[in-house]
Amino acid sequence: MMGKPNSTPAKTQKSISSFFAPKSSQKPQDSSSPPASKAPGNLDDADSNEGTNEDAKITGNRLKRVLEEDENGGNTGAKERPSKRAKSVEVEEEDNESYALPAADSRKTSSSLTRGKSKPSLRTNKYMFSGSSQRATESLIEEEPEDELEKARKVELHKKFVKKLGHPDSLRRIIHEDDAALEVGDEEGEEDEEAPAPVKTKKKGAKTGKLTPMELQVIDIKRKHMDTLLIVEVGYKFKFFGEDARTAAKVLSIVCIPGKFRFDEHPSESHLNYFASASIPVHRLPVHAKRLVAAGYKIGIVRQTETAALKKAGDNRNAPFVRKLTNVYTKGTYIDDIDGLDTTDAPSGGAPATGYLLCITETKAKGWGTDEKVEVGILAVQPATGDVIYDNFEDGFMRGELETRLLHIAPCELLIVGELTKATDKLVQHLSGSSTNVFGDRIRVERVGKSKTMAAESYSRVAQFYADKLKAHQSSNNAREQELLEKVLKLTEPVTICLSAMITHMTEYGLEHVFDLTKYFQSFSARSHMLLNGNTLTSLEIYTNQTDYTQKGSLFWTLDKTQTKFGQRLLRKWVGRPLLDKQRLEERVAAVEELKDNANTPKVDKLNATLREVRSDLERSLLRIYYGKCTRPELLTVLQTMQRIANEFAHVKTPSDAGFESIALNEAVASLPAIGEIVISFLDKINAQAARNDDKYAFFLEHYETEAIGDHKCGIGAVEQDLEAHRMVAATKLSKKTPVTYVTIAGIEYLIEVPNTDLKNVPASWAKISGTKKMSRFHTPEVIKFLRERDQHKESLSSACDAAFSTFLSEISTHYALIRDTISHLATLDCLLSLATVASLPGYCKPTFTSSTEISVIGGRHPMVEQLLPSAYIPNDTSLSTSPDHTRALLLTGPNMGGKSSYVRQVALISILAQIGSYVPAESARLGLLDGIYTRMGAYDSLFTAQSTFMVELSETASILKSAGPRSLVILDELGRGTSTHDGVAIAEAVLDWVVRETKCLCLFITHYQTLASVARGFEKGKELRNVHMKFTAERNGRRVSNADADKDNEDFDEEITFLYEVGEGVAHRSYGLNVARLARVPKSVLDTAASKSRELETQVKQKKLLGLSNMISNVLENGTDQLDQLIIGMEQL
């Protein structure tokens, strides 16, 4: 109820001439008397009285007043009626749920509600429907305090009533036995549900068990959407019913009123008369909806689709309000908030999801066991940005290819078409079922069936979808759109099935329009980027660290110095997809170099300042405009930001005007002013202040308003003129010579005040609305009619304003491609500036690229570890090349904790950084372009595929041997440790030999098997494979022991080991495992036993080697020099 408090003096009604003139803002306030809550047992009290004929109420009031005047002379009746009137109104007011909301605007689900809305201006208030004309006849009668005689009389009547009843509170006790009073609380301070009123009233369905009209509505909608948690609009609250109420109470920490939880009328709940329920206030809907979606639920908003004034003017005035499911949201489709879901607040604290929905389908498996092959099709869409990724590939029994794509895309929701094979299903469950997985949060999984004719149906549905789009968008770009359509129709069968399923799926959420943007379809398998498989992403910590799966400590965290959300998303793509195109790569590096070298110049400062001023996510907002979900303040922010950017670079007409030497920078800057004229043309049509305040009635400037808006505003003005003219008519009936003055009390307008001494002149047809001890206030029948007509115009005006705004958004959407390209260039500039910031760090250098496959780094460092270490990182050199007479593989040995894994990760990360276009942490770097990096690091089993640690190890190794090529980098860490020493050494030696001889790729092989050093002797000295180790120093009894002498005595327990973290030539003959045990604080008695056993085992090994050498010597003496080489190798190993 809109208006001023009762204590405020009555305000004279404004004249019509002041209606269209600008006025100072006036803050509307709620009535001081909130409506009483209804009994929780009856969910449809509001609907049961919705259709009551208002004329009957007016007639009843008129007859009561006439009787009072006849019996009491016009004064006493006015004194006695208020208490009864107040009680009846208190019960009825909430029953009319349509009057609980002050305006139709309060039903909006825009994200602006979460930030608070500005108070509308007085002029806008004139257009807003407040329902005051309907409430006028039902308002409380305001009275002066009762005198002492009246109070005493009422006390006496109450005593007689109690005596007749038998004892105090007996009526309340009776009611409590039928319907227990339940209190509702909300930890957030929201409006509470009150206990049932202590008055026994007849409630529909309370005893008969019959469902009320609103309950039938809820059940009907719920049965059609059983997988959806429904939030139902009921008057001034949103409510949850049944099992949905219990779920919402748990997630939102609100109270659930007990009742029926099932929607199938199960006999076990036949004794219950009403549904369980929980409620939230209207203004908190966006907050709670976001929390439910973030918790993984699919929610639906059920709204009243008709308004009070138009309902009373329609044919269904006696029926309940019509309710429909208007919005459905899940994690991937929640775009009604510009900030989306803040996944950093997830319970797991994991990395933020990318917002992709990913659809998977696959064919039946071919082959058995390790020979199993399946064909998989995927399609992922990011509704917030419009990006679509698709792929079709064959996968082995380990499902490594699918895992790679899932880790790259990091979806927040999966749609599975048809049945999956057991291995695929287990992989999906493993990645989606844990809140501590690499995605940082649980993934919502939805499944749909797959018929035998799915392929044909999908092709037909996709073709029809795009044919309809082409028909609806006949334009000058039709040839281009036709070309894009042909691209979509050429997709493979599995991808087409996914696309069809995704179109159907997104239609439920009203987001199917994202597939119109076929320009942004990308193939995952396009070999224009380096391939980083799932193991590589995890082992090298590209997106998240391996400790707690957060971004801190990852490569992306190291590079992310972006200033915008859309720039951050683009950088994430760059990090996961390093370039293979040498020309594009050199252009990107040149742009970074120029930005770094000109860091404090005006042109670079202008770019930084422009990006700092972008405070909204333009890419998300543009998609929300395209979907028609953008709010007015958000639209104003987008248009003004784009205008500001265009004005900053208005002088740039061609790329050469940008003033940079880099082609990439000039092209990006030159695209920014291209949208200036388009944006200004839209800004010229809107009222900026009204848009900022989310004022729909004044959003458009007057000469740009639609005809419907103008007609309804004129209609409201005409009604105001009629009301003004009615002042003299009312005065004539009161026998006055001057026009009456309208007053507004408690939000009820156009009241005529009459002193109680003059009530004899008031016509019987006038309806008394409120009064005091000295004054009575009335509405004439004509005023009631005019107000009802005005309210109908106001609600129609509201609908017309929404329709005009929707059309306005559609007009902007026609320029989507141009605006999107501008935002993409702005994101590119943000990423380049981020890389330039990293390049400015101490010790970073510009990499140079060669046509050969090589990695030549001097003074290289680990990019993440050096930022996390409190001390300086020890640099190392690396030289690998596939060219003849060069080393292409390193066999790396060294003590435990000596830095072997950090070194090989450093080499891989430097290569990735270079191909992203970044500077690298080294003194100098000369690199060839790698087409893939493959890693096999760590030890873990795979319960979801029932594989042991060693099986996982060998399966991943087999996948690497099949996938790696001459331009790849392979990293193998301690291969063979999952089995016995002899088997492990044999497998490790065979794999190493294969990689070096057959694959001929760059390789870093870490091992603790010193015997593998002999493999290098199978190649020419100093070529192909070279033995290196991590340097260390050992001190025994204060005397330094060299690596060569380390194994002469086995007293390693008494040695002090110092790690140098430098790479040196040769083999580390010992691993110093007992030193690590001592650092781990293993008990001394255990260490003593281990040291003794270690010496014993090593002595036995030496004895066996000596015996073997003596046999070799005998063979050499008997058979000549044929086995002389083997003898030399054995002596060296000994």
Swiss-Prot record:
| Region (Disordered) residue spans | 1-145, 183-207
What keywords would UniProt list here? Answer: ATP-binding, DNA damage, DNA repair, DNA-binding, Nucleotide-binding, Nucleus
Composition bias type Acidic residues, residue spans: 183-195
- List the GO terms this entry assigns under cellular component, sorted alphabetically: nucleus
Gene3D superfamilies found in the cross-reference section? 1.10.1420.10, DNA repair protein MutS, domain I, MutS, connector domain, P-loop containing nucleotide triphosphate hydrolases
- Which residues lie in Low complexity bias regions? 21-40
Q: Name one GO molecular function term.
A: ATP-dependent DNA damage sensor activity
InterPro entries (UniProt xref): DNA_mismatch_repair_MutS-lik_N, DNA_mismatch_repair_MutS/MSH, DNA_mismatch_repair_MutS_C, DNA_mismatch_repair_MutS_clamp, DNA_mismatch_repair_MutS_core, DNA_mismatch_repair_MutS_N, DNA_mismatch_repair_MutS_sf, MutS
Q: Where is the composition biased (Polar residues)?
A: 1-18
Q: Where is the composition biased (Basic and acidic residues)?
A: 78-90
Predominant subcellular localization, coarse grouping: nucleus
Per UniProt, subcellular location reads as: Nucleus
**Which Gene Ontology BP annotations are present?**
mismatch repair; mitotic recombination
Ligand binding (ATP): G894, P895, N896, M897, G898, G899, K900, S901
Description of how the protein assembles with itself and partners: Heterodimer consisting of msh2-msh3 (MutS beta). Forms a ternary complex with MutL alpha (mlh1-pms1).
Similarity section: Belongs to the DNA mismatch repair MutS family. MSH3 subfamily.
What job does the chain carry out? Component of the post-replicative DNA mismatch repair system (MMR). Heterodimerizes with msh2 to form MutS beta, which binds to DNA mismatches thereby initiating DNA repair. Msh3 provides substrate-binding and substrate specificity to the complex. When bound, the MutS beta heterodimer bends the DNA helix and shields approximately 20 base pairs. Acts mainly to repair insertion-deletion loops (IDLs) from 2 to 13 nucleotides in size, but can also repair base-base and single insertion-deletion mismatches that occur during replication.
Protein known as: DNA mismatch repair protein msh3
Please tell me the species this chain comes from: Botryotinia fuckeliana (strain B05.10)
Lineage in the entry? Eukaryota, Fungi, Dikarya, Ascomycota, Pezizomycotina
Q: Give the gene symbol.
A: msh3
